Amino acid sequence: PVDIDRLLIVTFTNAAAGEMRQRIRDALEARAEEAPENAHLQRQLVLIHNAQITTIHSFCLQVLRSHFHMIGLDPGFRIADEGEMLLLRQDVLKETLEEAYELGAGEVNTAEAEEFRQLLEQLAPGKDDQAVQNALLQVYQFSLGQPWPDEWLAGCRMAYCRPDKEETTPEPDWVRFAVKDTKRVLADVREEILYAITLCQAERGPYMYEKAMRDDLAMVEVLQEADGYRELAKAFAVSGTYTRLSTKKDESVLKEQKEQVQELRAGIKDARASVRVQYFYDRPEVLEETFYASGVVVRALTRLVERFMEKLTEKKREKNVLDFSDLEHLALEILVVHDETGTQASPAALEYAEQFEEIMIDEYQDSNLVQELILNSVAGRGRGEANRFMVGDVKQSIYRFRLACPELFLEKYQTYRERENACRIDLHKNFRSRSEVLDGVNEIFRQIMTENLGGIVYDKDAMLYPGAVFAPDSGEARRLPEFLLLDPEDQDKQEAEARLVGMRIQQMVGSFPVWDAKLSAYRPLAYRDIVILLRTVSGWAETFGEVLGDMGIPCFTGSQKGYFSAVEVRTVLAYLEVLDNPVQDIPLAAVMRSPIGGFSDEALAKLRSASEEQRFYDCCIAYRDNGEDAGLRLALDTFFRQMEYFREKAAYTPIHLLLWEILDVTGYGAYAAALPAGRQRKANLDMLVEKAIAYEATSYRGLYHFIRYIESLKRYEVDYGEASPGTESDDTVRIMSIHKSKGLEFPVVFVSGLGKQFNETELRGRLALHSSFGIGCDYVDTTLRLRQPSLLKKVIQKTSALENLGEELRILYVAMTRAKEKLILTGAVPNASQKLEAWQTLNIRAMETLSYSTLTKASSYLDWVLPALLQHSGEDCFLLRVLSAEDLLEESREAKASDLWRVLEHPKEEPEARRYLERVFSEGYPYEQEQAISGKVSVTELKKQTELPEEHEGLELYP
């Protein structure tokens, strides 16, 4: 047996590590109760408190705390928060560019200075250098995903060095990729041509088209035989034009088959044209020249990034702070000896390797290259032993934006069965979902997940097999997964789709049976059993939340956006800006118009028009001193006195205490809490105070830097989402992103927004980055003012597009596998009927998987899911419904009528409501006597009342 403190167990999050530790402790305690005499179990219960069950960052932190002296690190370092690092990077970026400007403007015209000037001219020809700043930070952030960023940057620069003319160099990897990708497309095209020829030869087929299709086949086969990029380019150049389809008319030919061949021909021509435009858009000699000429940008930019990294490291050492990237790279520096001969474990790594009997890695598919090297260095017990146990599912690798490298997993997945000292264990069973859900997932992904897209063939080894046990039910519930395709017509797509989802929820809640493991019985579906998963919640969760709320469906969005746009947060931040610098017109007007100032629009207009001063602040001061309206002058005096009081306090008061006093003295905190959604607003203001406390723990001080701190968070979209005063445990429908749902499970899952276009912003930037291929950019002719992407940039863009599509495929897989009992896919697309016809044409021949071209041309999840369902009709695995906006309206009417009749026929007994109503209707009116008293009494009546007999002397009068 092995003691638990001799294992290194690494997982993805602190929460997962804590849960794993607790589960192991619970299991040990249970076993110890069964065998109290077992000394080994008792020992593990003691050792588990020191067991290395941790995240990779926590392990790296421990390495740094123990071996700080090896790299000259001050042991008192702390981890900077994201806001502080944003400020620090901005300060260093400014210094770096100022140095570069001084060099570029210097009298000595060095090559570096000239290249920097060209960098500015090509990336930032306008009035500012924001594009250069963005490019520098983009390359810097990307380089941190490489084990040795300096080497990667140098390699990117070296790629643009011309080889000697006498030197024969092999084609670079990125050129070979262009050839490989072209061959994949050509293979698809050839299959399409062969199928078209089959249709031509069929009974009543368009035989007159066969010659043209055979000419196409010959052309494609010539291209396929070309070896290497230059031969392919030459083959494309001489391939000539297409033979026209025959115009011969024959009534015996079926119109449908004729149109099918025409559509196939159009697709064949498009595919060939697209690959030519992608990789062979000019002569190889010209493309080679433009490639080397574009290197000026990469050389200048990589030097800037290197200088930026040096200065940032100096600043961080001065302030004795590290960020999370430093944890990994400094730990790598301690654990790995890296030189021109290669890499090997350091003495420190060998010490750890001796300590750990086994390295266990959870969620291995999300590891990156740096983490792989770190864990590999402490594995093998220093003697090359195979003692790593890795668990993961590459189909769920969805963190490419964090530079996760699923290729690490795939390499082991593909080789471990053949290696002597390795073993691959396939875990086929799924213990979450019903067989109907799994059958639906398998039906779709066996057709769309391939080695070329997604990284793995979805074969019998990758498929899901049911392992969960559900008690038999009545069989009345329709448990097949559903696909609801909506044509919104002239309605807003998001709102229409949200209504569709809401209607389906209303139909299911209270009637659809779900298995409750705690009750060991079926019960009606509740709102808390339902989740709506979206690819992105920004702009979608708000719409779904509003629509569902209007339909009476409680929902919890947990949105990650909206905090800095909340009116109460904007108001307080504007006040802080005014305290820092009162001559800012917009923040000053915002605060004065808010409840803090209490000035009306008319008052602000009067202040602006009463003075010729240009700044609004000066207008206010002038009116305060000499204005006509005494009331307005008094209000201004009160406002500015209070503002000056807070300005003086800001000089020596911690920001969080200043915020508390502002909210208290101005009354704005109480005001916000009294508004509708007051709990939410109060929570938002409390969060702002918490952010101030976090800021005060940084190396920055003062109100000015706090405002910069917040502005940096806003600029780089580090939005924390509105603070939530509620909890996810309430009986509400949850709306969340697919990424947030990873690792979770829900009885009923709606995967919505499938018609949303994939985000391709990354592919349209000035730079294209790749860990293996380097940096691609545009060739710019500054004389002719022409811009053209280099071949390397085109290759990286295509590579990134394929990697993005593979990521989207895996994200869809994660979403669909969250469902336990019912899976419902929804999407809205205009002209749905026409789209269906277009998707149907992709399936005119039965294929085991969709073609490479079909998969890579997808612009939304619908472009994968619907062709896959239409391919084999999917009737046994999915219920497919196409609805129009009118259908939606009609179903809504029917649902409302059905709900009304259900209430009338089967009224629900509510004991508490019954008791309340009985009490209200049975109680007498407590002020019955006062009803006889008049609200108004005339003088005559009063005179009469003075003459009342003695028995009425005690009667009170209420004026």
PLM features: what roles do these ranges have?
Residues T761-L802:
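Conserved catalytic motifs of ABC-family nucleotide-binding domains
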Residues I71, G755-G765:
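Cytochrome P450 core scaffold surrounding the K-helix E-X-X-R motif
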Residues R6, Q130-L322, A422, R499, ...:
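Conserved ATP-driven helicase/translocase motor core recognized via long
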Residues Q62-F68, Y279-D282, L301-M309, G384-R388, ...:
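Active-site-adjacent bridging/hinge elements
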Residues P1-D26, D81-L87, D91, E98, ...:
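Conserved motor-region signature of P-loop NTPase helicases/translocases
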Residues I4, T11-A15, R25-L232, E318, ...:
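Conserved ATP-dependent motor core of P-loop NTPases, especially the RecA-like helicase ATPase domain
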Residues P1-G72, K315, K319-S325, L330-E333, ...:
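P-loop NTPase Walker
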Residues I48-Q62, L123-P147, L301-R307, L322-L335, ...:
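Core structural elements
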